Amino acid sequence: MRIIGVISDTHGLLRPEALAALEGSELILHAGDVGDVRILDALERIAPVHAVYGNTDWGEVRQRLPRTVEVDLGSVDGAAASGTPAGPIAHVHHGDRELDLDPAAAGIVLVVSGHTHRPLVEERGGVLYLNPGSAGPRRFTLPATVARVRVGDEGKLEAEIVALP
């Protein structure tokens, strides 16, 4: 079983509790509003990171990151493989309205987004939709959260939201 850490909306704040919750991940996905490239560097010390920029990311963060990314959850570093992927494919983008494809038709089994700060785990049409919530400054009386996705041997996905103290 493989563990994928998922984080979003750090807005320049990487809590020690978020790092602790992501420890043990073999791959980390960041769904935007990173706030500072040093956050990506800190996450890279845990596992390879695939991230997208969000609507509040500018400068070096926006230059360094794509708007969307597809990640092979079965490969060692998550790199999108040419040819047959090693495992299930995840599509990562920031805003929930940025999805411009039919995930099931594209062979995508996990869609990760951020932006709303509201955690969400929902399966629709064979696709798991995940918003890890916000790990950054608290807003809208919502808790600070991250998520973990377990990838089973058969490619089965199980997601959980982890509330940060």
Task: Give the role of each language-model region.
Residues 1-49, 57-67, 86, 142-145:
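N-terminal active-site segment of His-dependent metallophosphoesterases
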Residues 6-8, 27-33, 50-55, 91-94, ...:
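Active-site neighborhood of phospho(di)ester-bond hydrolases with catalytic His/Asp-centered motifs
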Residues 11-12, 97-98, 135, 164:
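Residue-level signature for short turns and capping positions that connect secondary-structure elements
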Residues 12, 33-35, 53-59, 76, ...:
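Short, acidic/turn-prone active-site loops that include or flank metal/cofactor-
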Residues 15-20, 39-42, 80, 98-102, ...:
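Short, flexible, glycine/charge-rich loop motifs used to bind or transfer phosphoryl groups or to couple energy/partner
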Residues 48-98, 105:
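Helix-adjacent hinge/juxtasegments
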Residues 70-84, 106-107, 123, 130-165:
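Binuclear metal-dependent phosphoesterase catalytic core
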Residues 96-124:
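Non-DNA-binding regulatory cores of transcription-related proteins
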